[in-house]
A protein has these predicted regions:
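Bacterial N-terminal signal peptides that target proteins for export
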Residues: 1-12
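PEST-like low-complexity, intrinsically disordered acidic/proline/serine-rich tracts
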Residues: 14, 20-299
Length: 299
């Protein structure tokens, strides 16, 4: 988020966030109940994609994942991971978690308390994104657009907010323990037609959503990128960290990512943030609306 973020969008995000804490029962469907194939591009511009065909392949036989793919926008600024009652244009549903089946992140008791502390509206402006810092991996690729450039030795993933990861397809071991990165250290390999990205060495600072979810610096994250046809890319992410969670859990993109045509121009755009950034002001204003007694007194 940056200067394009509007007050109404922030208010909607906060309202859905607060509503997401209400238990929901008897819900079916994933990713906010959106219909399959109803993907809406993050910034998608350009013509509709050509009809789907066979999976494109590289000379070595692996799928060619090069291109621009758009996920669903419905959950883009809330990234609702768990079951939620809906509101503000977001349909009630199970969120993005597909395992465990109940759609609830399996936090350790202390970690759940920390998540709730971060979720409290008084801590809303602690979100690093409001400071023009990085999203986490899931927040980058579960919505919006993903630009991918396939190669023999390296695979470049360019996600939302111009956050780029270079996946080393040859290296077998991760960086030394002391090197900690915002998006971790990604190394990749192929399992049949699925590209697997294995990441460790996180610095623990990004949040998974505006709701304060986190996975900690010692997380081990495995992503799977699988093409269904020439226009459709499925993505899942499995997270494990025994210090934070009671078991591993898996989320997926809001909708299957579909190929966007003529969208390379988005990669070339300069995505400014510090210049004219208004996120912190919006987040603080939301807090003061909820707690007017804590608002600064007029001089």
């Amino acid at each position: 988020m940056n200067s394009r973020t509007t007050p109404s969008l922030c208010i909607a995000a906060l309202a859905v966030l607060l509503a997401a804490t209400v238990p929901v029962a008897g819900q079916d469907g994933r990713a906010g109940g959106a219909a399959p194939g109803a993907a809406q591009g993050g910034r998608g511009r350009g013509a509709a994609p050509e009809p789907a065909g066979p999976i494109p392949r590289r000379p070595d036989g692996h799928p060619d994942l090069t291109g621009t793919f758009s996920g669903g926008l419905q959950l883009s600024h809330t990234v609702i991971l768990e079951a939620h009652p809906g509101g503000f244009g977001v349909t009630a549903g199970k969120g993005l978690i597909i395992d465990p089946p109940d759609g609830v992140i399996p936090y350790q008791p202390w970690a759940l308390a920390e998540r709730d502390r971060r979720r409290d509206d008084s801590n809303g402006y602690e979100d690093p994104v409001g400071h023009c810092e990085f999203y986490d991996i899931g927040r980058v690729h579960s919505f919006g657009q993903t630009y991918q450039f396939d190669g023999d030795d390296y695979f470049i993933i360019h996600g939302n907010q111009h956050q780029t990861r270079v996946v080393d397809m040859k290296r077998k071991t991760h960086l030394p323990e002391g090197i900690r990165l915002w998006l971790g250290d990604p190394i990749g390999h192929w399992e049949g037609d699925t590209m697997v990205v294995d990441s460790t060495n996180f610095n623990g600072r990004p949040r998974m959503a505006i709701g304060g979810d986190f996975y900690g610096p010692d997380a081990h994250i495995v992503e799977r990128w699988t093409m269904k046809d020439s226009n459709t890319l499925n993505w899942t992410m499995t997270i494990e960290n025994p210090k934070v969670f009671t078991r591993a859990w898996t989320m997926t993109s809001a909708l299957p990512m579909t190929r966007a045509q003529n969208a390379r121009e988005n990669y070339d755009d300069e995505d400014t943030c510090h210049e004219g950034n208004v996120d912190l002001a919006h987040l603080k204003n939301l807090y003061y609306q909820v707690h007017p007694e804590k608002a600064p007194k007029a001089q």
